[in-house]
C-alpha cells in the first residue's frame, strides 16, 4: 500500500529540459500561497492510502482495519476519478467479507437512474443506505468525486458528496459505522469495479485526518476553507489568495495535460514497435554458394579383354568399345560419377524449393511439396543439379483481402502468408462478428440517415432510428410526406413499398388502422356509406356489413347481418371469448369449457376453478382472493376489492403495501422477472442466475435473462444471449416499446377498464368506447357524463403520445387523456375545452370551464360523484378534489375536425411531467417542466366529458425511466431563484 503526503516531490522532464526548472515559479507561488495558512495554525497532515496499487504490489486490506476502527477518527475521505459508459452501472469500490461476501462499505453508481448509493455496516449488523439522487456520473465523461464522512464512529454522523469540485449533496444524522468490522485481518477483502470497454478507474484513495481543503487539493480542487483560521487576513489578502490559487490551479492543469500527452505518445510508440512486421528477424535462409560438380576420378586400367558386351557401365550409360577396351559415357541426370559407378545427387542441397517447403530427394531427382497456406504456386519436381538451380519453386503470397477474408467495409491488412482483420473503415460501425454497416449518428449531419422531415433517435447500444416528424409520415423516417391528420399515413403515395408509404384513405380524419369495409378506397372513418350497401351510415343498422334489407329480429340497434346475438337484445355486442357469439347468448362466455351457470369466473378463463377464500368467486377474477367478498365491491375502481383494500401505500406507486412486491421502492409496473416475489426494482439479482445485477462479482451483462457464464463474444458489455432482445420477449429491442420488460411489447388498449366519474343521476349517459387498429385507436361516440377508458398496464416512467381529433361541429366540451391512474380518485388528467361555459348543474358548487388545455392532479376525498364531476369541469383548484398544475396561457380551444398530436413525459421517481401539443408540425402548447409527486406512477387511458365523436388515433406508449436533460436545467434555475 502506497502512502502519499501532500509534501511529496514531483519532477517532470520535457525533452532535455527539466520541467521543474521551467516551472519553478509555480512551486514558489504554492509556497507563498500556503504561508498564511501555516502562520494561521498548522493542521494535521492527511494520511493518504492509495487503493489502486501497481501490479507488482499486492494490497493488504488488513492495513485499513486499524484506521477505520480508530475511535479518535472523526473524519474520513474517499476520493476517486473515473469514467463510465453512458447509462451503465458499477460498484466503484467496496470492503467485503472474504468468507461470506457480506458488505462492510460500498459505493455504487447507478447510471440508468442517475443515482449513487453508499452502503455501510451499522452497529446492529444491518446495512445502511445513503442515496444520492440526480447525479450525472455515467455519461462517458471523466468525473472526480470526494466523499467526506464525519463522526461515523460516534453516531449522528454526516456524509458530504463533492462532484467535480462542487458539493452536490449532504446527508446528516447517520448511524454509527465500522464498529462491526471484523477483527480478523484475513477476512477483509477490497474490490474495485470490473472494467468494461471505454471505462476506466484512474484514481482511488482513502484519506484520514486533515481538512477538507487539504484533501480537495489532492484532486486539484480548491474549495472555500470551511474551518475558521486564526489569522484570516484582510479582504485584499483573500482576493489575492483566490487569484493565486486560480493561477496555481491552471498551472497544475497544464502539468496533468503534459503528462497525459507524454503517456499517449509513449504508448503509441510502444504499440507501433510491437506491431511492426519489418522490425523482427528475417525468416528466410541465405542460399548456399554454388558447388562444383566433382570430377570423376580416372578410370582404372581396363583389362584388354573386357568389352561392352559385359555391361561394365552404370545402367543407362552409353558404352563404346575402343582399341584398348571400352569407354563409358557420362552418368544420367541426377547422378554423379565416372560412368561405371554413379551416385545419386541430392538436389535438395541446392534449395530448389520455396523457403519453408519440404524438399524430398528421389533417386533420381527431387520433389517440392505444395506451397504453404497463404501462398499459391506449382509443385516442382525434376532431376539434376542444373534443373534444381534453374527451376526454383516460386510461391506467391495470396492476398486474402481481395478474396473477402474480412467482413465487408472493414480494414483488412494483408501479411506475408496470412492476413489480419482490423476495425470497420471510417464511416462504418460494427465488428468482425456483427459486420460493418454504414455509421449512422444523430449528432453528425453527414452520418444522419434520416429525412429532413424526420427526427433522429439514438437507441440502446448506439443504434439509430428515424421517425417522421409530427405532421409527416412515411417509411421509417427515411422517406416522409405530408400527413395532415397525423395518423401516420401520408396525404399522397410515396416512392417506397412500406405500408406507411400508401396514400391515406381518409386524408382529413385520423384512422391509423386504415379500415375500409367495402374496399372502395375510402376509409370507414370518412365514408358516408362504409359498407357500400346504398344506405348511409346514420340510417344503417349494420354500418360495416352490407345489408340492404336491414332485417333486425331482436329490435336492438344492430341488424341481423352484424348482430352477434340475433335473437337477444344486446346493444353492447360484448363478446368476451371472441368466438362471434355475444355474451348475452353465449352459455360459455369465456370459452373455458365450463358453462356460465357453473363457472365461478364466467368472463375469465379458469379451468381449475380455484377459489381459495371459498366465496364462490374464482381466484382468477376475485378482487380479494384471500378474503371472502362474494359481491366483489370495488368502490374506488383500483381492481382491489373493498374487503381487502387498505389504501396504505408507503411509496405512493398505486399498490398497497400488503400486495406491493417492493413496498418501499417506487415500482408501479411491479415487474418481477424471476417470479420470486421480489420486484426487480428492489431485487439484487433480477433473473436469479447467481450473478448480481450491479454488485461484485457483477454487474450482470444480461440482467433479465439467466446467463451465469456471462458470454460476451464482442466484449460490448451486453451478453450474447440478450444482445438484440434484452428482455427475451421475442420482440427485438428496436421495435419493443419496453425493451427491459418482457410483459409489455406493443401498444394495446384492446383490454381496458371503464370508469364512470358521475355514476349517480341521469343528466347524461355513460361513454361508449370503440377500440380499433389492434388497440392503437379509440373512438368515443356519445355526448356523455365524465368517464375514463383505462388500460390495465401500469408504468413507472413512461412516454405517451397520440393524435387527438374531434370529428364533429356540434359540441364544445372536454376531451383529453390520463396518466398515473391508481384509482378513480387518484390520477393525472390533461383536458382541453373548446369554449368558456358554466356547468348546468350548480350543485354542489358553481363550476366554470375556461377554454384551453389544462393539466390537473386529481386526488379526490369523495371519489366519483357530483363533487368530482364539478371539480373536473371547473378551471382551477378545488379543495380536497383537484389541483390545477398548469394551464395553456393562450386560452385557445380546440378546433372542429382538426388533428392535434400530444407528447407526454412522466418520470414519477422525481415527479417530472411535461406535455406538448402540435397542430400539424407546429408546436402550439408546452407545459414546460412541471414537478408533482402526487401519483408515483400508474396506468394510462383517455378522458371525455360531455363531448361526442372524439378520436384518439395512432396511440403509442414507451417505458422510459431516463431523466430528461431539461430536468437538470430546471433544478439549477430553481436553486438560483431560491438563492436570490
From Swiss-Prot:
Residues 43-210 form the Laminin G-like domain. TSP type-3 repeats lie at residues 482-514, 515-550, 551-573, 574-609, 610-632, 633-670, 671-710, 711-746. Homopentamer; disulfide-linked. Interacts with PTBP3. Interacts (via EGF-like 3; calcium-binding domain) with ATF6 and facilitates its processing, activation and nuclear translocation. Interacts with NOTCH1. This is Thrombospondin-4. Pfam families: COMP (PF11598), EGF (PF00008), TSP_3 (PF02412), TSP_C (PF05735). Residues 659-671 have a biased composition (Polar residues). Mainly expressed in astrocytes, and in ressponse to peripheral nerve injury, significantly up-regulated in the dorsal spinal cord (at protein level). One of its GO terms (cellular component) is collagen-containing extracellular matrix. It comes from Rattus norvegicus (Rat). Adhesive glycoprotein that mediates cell-to-cell and cell-to-matrix interactions and is involved in various processes including cellular proliferation, migration, adhesion and attachment, inflammatory response to CNS injury, regulation of vascular inflammation and adaptive responses of the heart to pressure overload and in myocardial function and remodeling. Binds to structural extracellular matrix (ECM) proteins and modulates the ECM in response to tissue damage, contributing to cardioprotective and adaptive ECM remodeling. The gene is Thbs4. Disulfide bonds join 308-319, 313-328, 331-342, 348-359, 353-368, 371-395, 401-412, 406-421, 424-436, 442-456, 450-466, 468-480, 496-501, 506-526, 542-562, 565-585, 601-621, 624-644, 662-682, 702-722, 738-959. Residues 679-690 have a biased composition (Acidic residues).
